[in-house]
Amino acid sequence: MPYETELISENECKSFRDRYDEEGLFSAKADINGIIVQLFTSDRDHIDMWRDNFYAASDRVRAHARLYCITDKEEPESKLYFEPATCTAFLFNFDYYGWVKSIALGIAGYILEGTHDTYSVHGAAIDVDDVGVTLIAPSKTGKTTQSW
């Protein structure tokens, strides 16, 4: 895994949320198979790609999950903290957007598995002359490049 992941408690989650106020961050909600995931980030490129990659969700609908993509020199390089009860993730120092997208899809999958017995894979699908091919591989291996 190119980044370290750590589970945190609800109190630690609240502490992070208090420290990294949502004001001044770009925010957008995405509808991922009916799961609403909200991204908060200071990176305009990340928010633009988020809006390009996912269907927009209404701001009037409460998010099932939240991702805070934060740049902070005091935090370790590319570290993910996840609080499972509220499905809140803090992504520190992630410059590669593909990981942000992958984590959002993973959290949506986590919710869908628990509530609907729906299981997902990380891949790309290609249809050529009515013949389908699926590429399944980890992030940053070129699935999109090969299937675009």
Where are these regions (language model features)?
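A noncatalytic interaction/capping subdomain that flanks phosphate/NTP-handling catalytic cores
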Residues: 1-132
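Glycine-rich phosphate-binding P-loop
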Residues: 128-148
